[in-house]
């Protein structure tokens, strides 16, 4: 009886999620940058013309092209046991008080897989929080997602679909706008700021800096522990704490940038004419 009830609940909750049957390749194929590339007859780029003014999305970035520092910072900030759980971190959920177990202000129990399930379902970050049915549905969605997608696919899709700040969606738009470089070139300091923005996309600079400084400190501590496991690194002095004041100045400058460096082209007028005629 309980099995039938659970199965019926599962079907009801997932019935409206058209993505539930979607493959990673389908989600990646449906991804649309906010700029359209206009090519000439020889396939050379004429211009990138912005065709979606609602958000700023760059190109889809493969996980292998994301810097190790960013992957490290994101997992430390959002989901330390990402590679250990099956969609829901029950250890974190059990440790959290029931009153704020699924509170969006507390990410301790909200895994990357659960967040991705919300993004794929079009929920994003609901301002009023999720209802109990939505919370249960998100848990089930994450479990289904883990059964059909590999971990690297989940992390790659998350990095490309997660909103970072303002109109910026996805790691390519973030890295090129705030840091003026591709995602593979982000260093530890830039990665810490990016991870802080995932937690609170529209927080003020001071809040972003405080969060980023904490993430950077965790990265340094883990790096030191890893070094101490090697014979040559035993007895090494711990690294100095991160310079939060310098990080504050860096984050302040980065968050003021608005230019997206992939918007230039060689023939803007010809490109726009070709786009109108397409």
PLM regions with names:
Residues 77-90, 96-97, 198-202:
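Cell-wall polysaccharide-cleaving catalytic domain and substrate-binding groove, primarily
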Residues 22-24, 53-63, 76-77, 139-140:
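N-terminal post-signal-peptidase region of extra-cytosolic proteins
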Residues 31-33:
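Short, small/polar residue-rich loop motifs at catalytic or cofactor-binding pockets
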Residues 65-73, 150-152:
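Periplasmic N-terminal gating module of Gram-negative TonB-dependent outer-membrane receptors
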Residues 37-65:
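His/Glu-rich zincin catalytic helix
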Residues 1-6:
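Bacterial N-terminal signal peptides that target proteins for export
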Residues 18, 105, 109-278:
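Non-catalytic, structured segments within soluble enzyme domains
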